[in-house]
Amino acid sequence: DAMLADWKAAGIDPQGKKFLVINSSKASKVDQDRDRGFMERMKALVPSMVMLDVQYVENDPVLTENVTKTLIQANPDLIGIFADNDMTGVGISKGIAAAGAAGKVMGYAFDANDVEIQAVKDGVLTGMVVQDPFGIGYKSAMFAVDALENRQVPKAVDTGATIVTKANIDDPKVHKLLYPNQ
């Protein structure tokens, strides 16, 4: 939904345009599920959007950069890219920059690292979807103790996610998610 809002804010009509998903590992069920969920939501929001074939890059940022740059150059109507982890996020941010497509191709990545954070600040990467690794670990330990002490634990826990963009990257709550050790 955030990407659609970004397109509208930039005056980009996504109808009939192209979109790309970069998959970090064909062997990872988590990444497969993440990508499938993302693509299904995009198709629900913009049914006429054309999904390019998912690109599998085996968690290689250099390969991701090259694939991103090549596909941007070959598809002038490509308006969005989703990278399903931080290494592919590094690659798409460098590929978008190398293709001179910052601000034209909206790039979102899952997870965050220093290169991606800088790319968001520089306006090359539109945003990142980040979790709360400290909170996830804390809750995991808490539920493990509860289970060992025969207390009831939830069957499922929504650990949440935050969309980080240039507009909120300096927010103290977002800073805590990006730099949990500080």
Protein language model regions, located:
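A conserved helix-loop-strand patch within extracytoplasmic ligand-binding domains
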Residues: 1-20
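Short, solvent-exposed amphipathic alpha-helices that sit
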Residues: 2, 29-49, 67, 91, ...
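Short acidic capping loops at alpha-helix termini that bridge into adjacent secondary structure
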Residues: 15-17, 48, 103-105
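Hinge/cleft segment of the Venus flytrap/periplasmic-binding protein
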Residues: 15-26, 30, 132-182
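Local beta-strand N-terminus motif with an aromatic residue
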Residues: 16, 77-78, 125
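Short beta-strand elements in bilobed, periplasmic/extracellular small-molecule ligand-binding domains
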Residues: 18-21, 42-58
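Hydrophobic alpha-helical
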Residues: 37-38, 53-119
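Paired acidic/hydrophobic, glycine-rich loop segments that form the ligand-binding mouth/hinge
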Residues: 127-129
